[in-house]
């Protein structure tokens, strides 16, 4: 933690460092330079619990306590950043298994697909959080290699990058379980959650979102976020680097939530 800006540390943060009651990670660097993040230990558990309030299925299931698997880039996945090839045991952090160990899913060979399928069946995650592109490649290769893989989790979330309608339809044709979109970032947490009715809602607990018109468009916006969720590193007017397609709306969703903006996608 020597590289963390000492002048920004409050006494509360210094005490957390002394007691090792903190966790540190880096952003993946997909939209900007990698940033070091410091937050209270097990911060994501509370984040899952907050997010579940925007989807009745997740609320009933208490997914923050579920065993979870993550399939996304191997460079950096939330709490895990690997420079070498880690073992199965080394990729289990708390109740989460990180599945991918290669930088490019297009280079996955049959042995890679067999390993991923075997580890999922061995770990038995109730919830799988995936990059939709990675999952679609995995499903294609399972079919191409004729691998017998029957495991079905209780829920799948699609995050990390934009999921097109065709990819969503393809995934749903192969996996029969509740599937929903999530949008967020390592530094902020979850910002948008798809409800059980298929509508994206702002997860507005301790967070405020501002949409700035993008290149004079009336339907495209730059996403600016202010978040107080992480007491060690609050973000004010943070430029996410992502673009939102949205229209004004004050309609009440069938799930009971009312979102002032109809957000169609984020990328």
Where are these regions (language model features)?
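Short secondary-structure boundary/capping segments
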Residues: 42, 85-86, 198
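Nucleotide 5′-phosphate-binding alpha/beta core
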Residues: 1-26, 31-67, 74, 122-129, ...
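Short, acidic Gly/Pro/Ser/Thr-rich loop/turn segments
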Residues: 34, 76-78, 230-233
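Short linear functional motifs in flexible/disordered or boundary regions
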Residues: 39-40, 63, 80, 140, ...
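Short hydrophobic/aromatic-rich motifs at helix boundaries and adjacent loops
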Residues: 23-25, 86-89, 139-140, 259
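Conserved AMP-binding loop of ANL adenylate-forming enzymes
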Residues: 56-94, 103
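Short, solvent-exposed polar/charged micro-motifs at secondary-structure junctions
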Residues: 2, 79, 190-192
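Active-site glycine/GP-rich loop and adjacent strand/helix microenvironment
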Residues: 95-267
